[in-house]
Design a protein with these regions (language model features):
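Ferredoxin-like iron-sulfur electron-transfer modules
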Residues: 1-24, 38-41
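Long, compositionally biased charged/polar accessory segments in the mid-to-C-terminal portions
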Residues: 23-184
Length: 184
């Protein structure tokens, strides 16, 4: 349109069952949409956990496993359409946030329980590792010595809890190493 417009999450497209334009056309494949089943009765408790570092885990506890037969039966009883249940079972968000645990909500300490999930970035490491600028842990770079400090990422994504961020970075680093070994 030639003018700046605010994101509306392409709600007319979403309502008609189509993905947003940005997720459909993203060359870098960094934008994904997915259905998440959740227990609405747990939202208030999750937002009110006393310790900020428990907010990330509390938000994960709100989500329901779309492969669990009891969850599927309850969803059907509550009138959730079959295609939504199937969408939840195939959701890339479920896989990244719940199964692989590499995606995180932004600033959970604000207690808004955002439903936008972020994958922490891996630093471009090959040249830095070869130049000795970052530490190595065997054949892989040490995630504690990446260019973006783990503490900084944890403060943005898990209210300061570093353990889930380190686990995610190590998983992604292992995947990077594996994929590189297949092509290099």
């Amino acid at each position: 349109s030639g003018k700046s417009e605010k994101c509306t999450l392409c709600y007319p497209r979403i309502e008609s069952g189509n993905p947003t334009v940005c997720s459909e056309t993203c060359v870098g494949r960094i934008r994904y949409l997915g259905v998440m089943l959740y227990d609405a009765d747990k939202i208030e408790d999750a937002a009110n956990v006393p310790a900020e570092t428990d907010l990330y885990d509390a938000q994960l506890d709100v989500f329901l496993d779309p492969s669990d037969p009891e969850v599927i039966a309850a969803a059907r009883r509550d009138g959730v359409p079959e295609d939504w249940i199937k969408g939840a079972q195939e959701s890339p968000i479920w896989k990244m946030a719940m199964e692989w645990k590499v995606a995180f909500p932004l600033h959970p300490e604000y207690r808004t329980l955002p439903m936008v999930w972020y994958i922490p970035p891996l630093s471009p490491i090959q040249n830095a590792a070869e130049a000795g600028k970052i530490g190595m842990d065997g054949a892989m770079p040490d995630v504690q010595s990446l260019r973006i400090p783990v503490k900084y990422l944890a403060n943005m994504l898990t209210a300061g809890d570093e353990a889930p961020v380190v686990t995610a970075l190590e998983r992604m680093m292992a995947m990077r190493s594996y994929m590189r070994s297949k092509t290099v």
